[in-house]
Amino acid sequence: MFLWLAHFSNWLTGLNIFQYTTFRAVMAALTALAFSLMFGPWTIRRLTALKCGQAVRTDGPQTHLVKNGTPTMGGSLILTAITVSTLLWGNWANPYIWILLGVLLATGALGFYDDWRKVVYKDPNGVSAKFKMVWQSSVAIIAGLALFYLAANSANNILIVPFFKQIALPLGVVGFLVLSYLTIVGTSNAVNLTDGLDGLATFPVVLVAAGLAIFAYVSGHYQFSQYLQLPYVAGANEVAIFCTAMCGACLGFLWFNAYPAQVFMGDVGALALGAALGTVAVIVRQEFVLVIMGGLFVVEAVSVMLQVGWYKKTKKRIFLMAPIHHHYEQKGWKETQVVVRFWIITIVLVLIGLSTLKIR
């Protein structure tokens, strides 16, 4: 919204700063951060008053039983902060902004309904897996179709392989939709599975969003994208504003979500943030880079699939407990040790992902 102030730069030279993406990206992060910090205490009080306490699974780690009753659905604060900040600092004429907000809020609505059922019926399982998959699939397919339609040229419909500048595979509409679906739905569920310890998913989301913000800015800048041999995606620079808003909102939320957590983001936050990250990766054509930078999310999801699949086949478990962060808890790691060590791993993975900008 503030972008329109740049039109009055002829009257007041200083207003010209509002046309710069970098300035608006920084301000989007600070605005979302301030919003989360300002309304965090109020949100926690309201959730507590509404008795929106987390129902902890009795078959999980016994150390988690003390978390029973901790307010959940705090992700609604994150989504509100992202939406407000993006609308304030983003370009409303950019279709990517509306697609991202649409995906964020649509999957957030699913998560909200899931959390609501858990709170009202005291059922840790929430909505059925079938209902959740149908909703996520619908959002991913609609977003994929919209992004394919917006593709200005064939360069926006290719599969980029990191570290190899000569490998770029054309996808076509079917391939594009399949890849978009897997990326958006897969990341949404992976982040949700990761959100099992205080702050475990929140800070990695910040790191991955920051990394994708850099890719978005570069991809939306013709000279930079050509120099780094990345596909030029017109308008993708505005996506960086959405990403930095996500960074700020999650950092502000982490203030209250750090151990011992005063509030959990719940499915309303985790499902939405994951889907948004996946959508950003599709826009900038960096699905494989997302797999690298979000390696923690991938490992968490794969650990669950391996555990379930192997148990169904052999009635034995690969891990002491899945997702894998619970495995390390069962091995004797403190919750804070698991969280910080997984953060460190994510920092390394994001740096590796950023190295693909130049190493080709």
From Swiss-Prot:
InterPro entries listed in its UniProt record: Glycosyl_transferase_4, PNAcMuramoyl-5peptid_Trfase, PNAcMuramoyl-5peptid_Trfase_CS
Annotated compartments: Cell inner membrane
Full protein name: Phospho-N-acetylmuramoyl-pentapeptide-transferase
Principal EC category: transferase
Membrane topology, from the record: Multi-pass membrane protein
PROSITE patterns: MRAY_1, MRAY_2
Catalytically driven reaction(s): UDP-N-acetyl-alpha-D-muramoyl-L-alanyl-gamma-D-glutamyl-meso-2,6-diaminopimeloyl-D-alanyl-D-alanine + di-trans,octa-cis-undecaprenyl phosphate = di-trans,octa-cis-undecaprenyl diphospho-N-acetyl-alpha-D-muramoyl-L-alanyl-D-glutamyl-meso-2,6-diaminopimeloyl-D-alanyl-D-alanine + UMP
Cofactor(s) essential for the protein: Mg(2+)
Listed GO CC annotations: plasma membrane
Keywords attached to this entry: Cell cycle, Cell division, Cell inner membrane, Cell membrane, Cell shape, Cell wall biogenesis/degradation, Magnesium, Membrane, Metal-binding, Peptidoglycan synthesis, Transferase, Transmembrane, Transmembrane helix
Cited Pfam families: Glycos_transf_4
Annotated TM spans: 24-44, 69-89, 92-112, 133-153, 158-178, 199-219, 239-259, 263-283, 288-308, 337-357
Gene name of this polypeptide: mraY
EC number: 2.7.8.13
Superkingdom classification of source: Bacteria
Example of a GO MF term: phospho-N-acetylmuramoyl-pentapeptide-transferase activity
Organism of provenance: Neisseria meningitidis serogroup C (strain 053442)
